[in-house]
UniProtKB/Swiss-Prot annotation:
Catalysed reactions, semicolon-separated: 2 H2O2 = O2 + 2 H2O
Coiled coil: none
Subcellular location, principal: cytoplasm
Species assigned in the record: Nicotiana tabacum (Common tobacco)
Name of the protein: Catalase isozyme 1
Swiss-Prot/TrEMBL cofactor(s): heme
Compartmental location: Cytoplasm, Cytosol; Peroxisome matrix
GO biological process, one term: response to hydrogen peroxide
Keyword list, A-Z: Cytoplasm, Heme, Hydrogen peroxide, Iron, Metal-binding, Oxidoreductase, Peroxidase, Peroxisome
Subunit structure: Homotetramer.
PANTHER family cross-referenced by the UniProt entry: CATALASE, CATALASE ISOZYME 1
CDD domains named among the record's database cross-references: catalase_clade_1 (cd08154)
Length: 492
């Protein structure tokens, strides 16, 4: 163990097996017993330590995004956007920032087949000179619900039945029938994009609106888009069944093998920019996470490229203990008023403290690469060696000072304290536009998924009728096609 770096090092390795305390182990095969056939003795310390360590190897899996794979690389700025943001890592073309990226499925468990229909996570941690920036997104640009109060129920509805531990669509369709805004996400979820061939051939989105702030303090809303340079590829249902039956880790293997062979995955980063004064000029709320921004009005602007050129060294240390948090931003970036984003800022840090421990940010994969200093101290599994006497601020014995203030949005927000739904719900327009943009065979696959799951015997006539109504309000012909195959009449 290299004590200066708190990591295993060949220079510090013992030539023989030892206990955790460094004591020599001369037999790693046979337990200490009373005679060759007698009972095992508790004084076999190495046996007890070995079993106790094994019993505690696993940590709680993520409540969402449990199944995933990670890789390292860099982000390079290719286009100047310094007029939009004072973020140091975006300061000029050519600037490179080390990153680690994690791809995942959202609902399914750790160890589940990566070929299952699901939204995919697309999270990038930028180790910038001003701290970590975590862009925690998905491979679809929208989400099922716009308010985090529904998020726990959303995930429970999507996850297996608590009685049988089987994922059942009657639960999903029952719950989301109360959330008409979810139809837009279903227009992605039941589409081909939720069966990506692998992680290298899928897009990524920041999902939420954020804000970019320049040196003058001018703010713009921004949305982030990742576009794979090797194109988007998806599987059919039949291909997904075959691939999953052959190798349940096919996407992880593809990512690892591609990087090992020097075929480095690459994505281009684009942004959409909206003036903060223009949010009321649309027929929807631009800060509603169930909506996309029209690219004909707010075109994609190129920013940079993401290249993954290094495999992780240890799956547990750099995938299972890897922790993302949308609350991690840097100067020149800020949150929007998106209700779901605002609550993710708390929820992600909270779940990491539960899953990994209160000092999860000390782990090498999570710690910033830049200099950092605060008085967050001690706690379970703290391994930071600190010898200072002053553990408070301000102090005349500690030269640490406040950082220089950086620009943040200065808009004045007023309103009553209330729990309410946004004014411009417009739940069906974008779902219909997406459906009409597809070729007929793609439309038919989408219709077939609805028919398949609405045919579940536990889906009631009322639930079917509600979904036919939603689909018809999005696109009349789509609703009619689903209804005719279910022998129901659309209500719209």
């Amino acid at each position: 163990m290299d004590l200066s770096k708190f990591r295993p090092s060949s220079a510090y390795d013992s030539p023989f097996l030892t206990t955790n305390a460094g004591g020599p182990v001369y037999n790693n095969v046979s337990s200490l017993t009373v005679g060759p056939r007698g009972p095992v003795l508790l004084e076999d310390y190495h046996l007890i330590e070995k079993l106790a360590t094994f019993d505690r190897e696993r940590i709680p899996e993520r409540v969402v995004h449990a199944r995933g794979a990670s890789a390292k690389g860099f982000f390079e700025v290719t286009h100047d956007i310094s007029h939009l943001t004072c973020a140091d890592f975006l300061r000029a073309p050519g600037v490179q920032t080390p990153v680690i990226c994690r791809f995942s499925t959202v609902v399914h468990e750790r160890g589940s087949p990566e070929s299952l229909r699901d939204i995919r996570g697309f999270a990038v941690k930028f180790y910038t000179r001003e701290g970590n920036f975590d862009l925690v997104g998905n491979n679809v640009p929208v989400f099922f619900n716009r308010d985090a109060k529904s998020f726990p129920d959303t995930i429970r509805a999507l996850k297996p039945n608590p009685k049988s531990h089987i994922q059942e669509y009657w639960k999903i369709l029952d719950f989301f029938s109360f959330l008409p805004e979810s139809l837009h996400t279903f227009a992605w979820f039941f589409d081909d994009v939720c069966l990506p061939t692998d992680y290298r051939h899928m897009e990524g989105y920041g999902v939420h609106a954020y804000q970019l702030i320049n040196k003058a303090g001018k703010a713009h809303y921004v949305k982030f888009h990742w576009k794979p340079t090797c194109g988007v590829k998806c599987m059919s249902e039949e291909e997904a069944i075959r691939v999953g039956g052959t190798n349940h880790s096919h996407a992880t293997k593809d990512l690892y093998d591609s990087i090992a062979a020097g075929n480095y995955p690459e994505w281009k980063l684009f942004i959409q920019i909206m003036d903060t004064e223009d949010v009321d000029k649309f027929d929807f709320d631009p800060l509603d996470v169930t909506k996309t921004w029209p690219e004909d009005i707010l075109p994609l602007m190129p920013v940079g490229r993401l290249v993954l050129n290094r495999n992780i060294d240890n799956f547990f240390a750099e995938n299972e203990q890897l922790a993302f948090n949308p609350g991690h931003i840097v100067p020149g970036l800020y949150y929007s008023e998106d209700k779901l984003l605002q609550t993710r800022i708390f929820a992600y840090a909270d779940t990491q403290r539960h899953r990994i421990g209160p000092n999860y940010m000390q782990l090498p994969v999570n710690a910033p690469k830049c200099a950092h200093h605060n008085n967050h101290r001690d706690g379970a599994m703290n391994f930071m060696h600190r010898d200072e006497e002053v553990d408070y601020l301000p102090s005349r014995f500690d030269p640490c000072r406040h950082a220089e203030q950086y620009p943040i949005p200065s808009r004045v927000l007023t309103g009553r304290r209330e729990m309410c739904v946004i004014e411009k719900e417009n739940n069906f327009k974008q779902a219909g536009e997406r459906y009409r943009s597809w070729e007929p065979d793609r439309q038919d696959r989408y219709v077939s998924k609805w028919v398949e799951h609405l045919s579940d015997p536990r889906v009631t006539y009322e639930i079917r009728s509600i979904w036919i109504s939603y689909l018809s309000q999005a696109d009349k012909s789509c609703g009619q096609k689903v209804a005719s195959r279910l022998t129901l009449k659309p209500t719209m």
